[in-house]
Amino acid sequence: MTNIRKTHPLMKILNDAFIDLPTPSNISSWWNFGSLLGLCLITQILTGLFLAMHYTPDTSTAFSSVAHICRDVNYGWFIRYLHANGASMFFICLYAHIGRGLYYGSYMFQETWNIGVLLLLTVMATAFVGYVLPWGQMSFWGATVITNLLSAIPYIGTTLVEWIWGGFSVDKATLTRFFAFHFILPFIITALVIVHLLFLHETGSNNPTGIPSNMDMIPFHPYHTFKDILGALLLILVLLTLTLFTPDLLGDPDNYTPANPLSTPAHIKPEWYFLFAYAILRSIPNKLGGVLALLLSILILIFIPMLQTSKQRSMMFRPFSQLLFWTLIADLLTLTWIGSQPVEHPYIIVGQLASILYFLLILVLMPTVSLIENKLLKW
């Protein structure tokens, strides 16, 4: 008799996705981040749901409702810090996942890659509106500064900003709608994740060599399920260590001051995972130019498959491309550091050089070096 998991309409879907899925035998731990992102998403939705039960999206009570969660709700402090640090873990996994895709040429699965870029944008939007909810100083001023960027759009900019605000400044209407967005977006993300997996399972996984591995596949379960469990345990270990020992390590002290429209913080900056884009935004003296550079710094990912000039898919056997890849990582870390610094000498010029290098590496140097590698291999 055929096993029920292969015949039942619902279990068949799960079976084909997580149990009998043919998987390359040589995929490394860099392939763990997809499942870790799924774990992060589930954690964020669950902790977020419990936080939403006690939170009030109103300017007069939002800050005190978060304080109430931390002080009076059973393990409320734990749920709140799990949610805040869970967002950081989410972005660490997200950036590692994208980095893996860039290094091993996974972007050649174009539909999967494009849905992935869309997912990145949606997660970024969710994190941004979520940061506004505690209604601390950095929440308020972060929302004001970032939404104000839309006023750089010619002709309709100001109207657009006021439409998003629901008034003439960030106020009650803004907080209420941001809470609504923050609640609905994770479910949209979940739907996109399913589409992302659907497209991935059309082609099958890539592997470190970038060479088709149809002749060497193993079932996903038990091999990769156990490998994923190890990754999950490490993720949980890091998240719990962060949450229980240094819950405020990645946060901003300014957010422990209630929002005050009459007092601007000395240094307005977003959470660490947006700092690289914030540095690129600040490095251009023109407002519209800065906004375009900010958008392009993320949307450039869409153009990566078109910039593939190498005859090889993966960077595994391309030392020059590897050098440029790690230069790009170092550049992004530099931009992240610059984004956290005040706008003064020497940070301004370092930020501008790092921003130029970021676009230069992706648009010019990497495609050129790939062509040189082809020539060296006489391809």
UniProtKB/Swiss-Prot annotation:
Q: Name one GO cellular component term.
A: respiratory chain complex III
Q: Which InterPro entries match?
A: Cyt_b/b6_C (IPR005798), Cyt_b/b6_C_sf (IPR036150), Cyt_b/b6_N (IPR005797), Cytb/b6-like_sf (IPR027387), Cytochrome_b (IPR030689), Cytochrome_b_C_euk/bac (IPR048260), Cytochrome_b_N_euk/bac (IPR048259), Di-haem_cyt_TM (IPR016174)
Q: How does it sit in the membrane?
A: Multi-pass membrane protein
Entry-linked SUPFAM superfamilies: a domain/subunit of cytochrome bc1 complex (Ubiquinol-cytochrome c reductase), Transmembrane di-heme cytochromes
Q: Which family does it belong to?
A: Belongs to the cytochrome b family.
Subunit comment: The cytochrome bc1 complex contains 11 subunits: 3 respiratory subunits (MT-CYB, CYC1 and UQCRFS1), 2 core proteins (UQCRC1 and UQCRC2) and 6 low-molecular weight proteins (UQCRH/QCR6, UQCRB/QCR7, UQCRQ/QCR8, UQCR10/QCR9, UQCR11/QCR10 and a cleavage product of UQCRFS1). This cytochrome bc1 complex then forms a dimer.
Q: What is this protein called?
A: Cytochrome b
Q: Which organism is it from?
A: Orcaella brevirostris
Q: What's the name of its gene? A: MT-CYB
